[in-house]
Design a protein with these regions (language model features):
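Extreme N-terminal "head/tail" segments of very large remodeling/mechanoenzyme assemblies
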Residues: 1-195
Length: 198
């Protein structure tokens, strides 16, 4: 629901988040989800389990180096819930945790159990120049269960790109060399940032 507000349009020239795209991130499963962000601001609200923290964690996963990345900040300080989310749990699509009494352990259920890819794309706009796209693409092989098993690549592009454009180059593994044609001036290899040359 959009509420009418008599606020001035934010000044052009300020870089603002304009769109978030998610593919196979948490319970955002099976297609590319697009969330346009209003230039005046956006309120993220919904019931428990509706994906609010997953969306915010996706944005953080693109903008924050792994060594400082703390997922599920909304639950931090909530004891056991604070450690339930990781890059692997998001790439795999963890949706349930149950207790296995026979083995005396907690077991996660996943939407994606085999080899899988995941993508997060953030498009920023200033209103005066071309958009800037930041993306992080992940591939997790079948059987991979730790963050060390994830291959990922980060993209910085000075134009609007779409997750559809890069999906073929991460669906079966991160293929940086093949990623270059849709992002022609990209540099880098798996595990490092890809930047477009100025």
């Amino acid at each position: 629901m959009t509420l009418p507000l008599d606020l001035p349009v934010p000044a052009t020239g300020q870089w603002r988040l304009a769109e978030v795209q998610l593919a196979n991130w948490g319970t955002f499963d099976g297609k590319i989800y697009r969330l346009p962000i209003a230039r005046r601001g956006h309120l993220v609200t919904g019931p428990s389990g509706s994906g609010k923290s997953s969306l915010l964690d996706a944005i953080a996963a693109v903008l924050t180096p792994d060594k400082w990345l703390r997922l599920n900040q909304a639950a931090q300080g909530s004891g056991a819930r604070a450690d339930q989310r990781s890059l692997v749990s998001y790439v795999r699509g963890a949706w349930s945790r149950t207790v296995d009494d026979d083995e005396d352990r907690v077991v996660s259920q996943f939407l994606r159990t085999g080899a899988t890819w995941s993508g997060i794309l953030l498009r920023l706009e200033s209103g005066t120049t071309q958009p800037v796209t930041l993306a992080r693409l992940f591939f997790l092989r079948a059987g991979g269960s730790s963050n060390a098993d994830i291959n990922d690549v980060c993209v910085l592009e000075r134009s609007a790109i779409d997750l559809r454009d890069v999906e073929p180059f991460v669906r079966k593994g991160v293929e940086v060399r093949k990623l270059r044609p849709p992002v022609p001036e990209a540099l880098g290899t798996s595990g490092v940032r890809i930047h477009r040359r100025a």
